[in-house]
UniProtKB/Swiss-Prot annotation:
Organism: Protochlamydia amoebophila (strain UWE25)
GO biological process terms, semicolon-separated: DNA catabolic process
Stored Pfam families: Exonuc_VII_S (PF02609)
Localization of this protein: Cytoplasm
Name by which UniProt lists this protein: Exodeoxyribonuclease 7 small subunit
InterPro entries, sorted: Exonuc_VII_S, Exonuc_VII_ssu_sf
Subunit structure, interactors included: Heterooligomer composed of large and small subunits.
Domain of life from the UniProt record: Bacteria
GO molecular function, one term: exodeoxyribonuclease VII activity
Amino acid sequence: MNNPSDQEPTASFETALCRLEEILEKMNSGTVSLDESLKLYEEADQLIIICNKRLNDAERKIEILVKNRSGELTLGNDDKPIIQDFKIASTS
């Protein structure tokens, strides 16, 4: 999973986010060389793109689910589609 271009087509949001956390820990450890830090930074940049794509896709799906009975999106006062927040239950 070290090459983000290999992950891009199939990487889930959670997988990409987990790898981003690993990279952050490694870079914050102070034990990596400058060259390795640059490679990790490049990988993190690609993973952020993957995460953004997955989040944008999810937002579009939510907008579809929030359509009113006539098939139109329910719009707020700002003329933007109303989307609903999902609350994730705590696992602790």
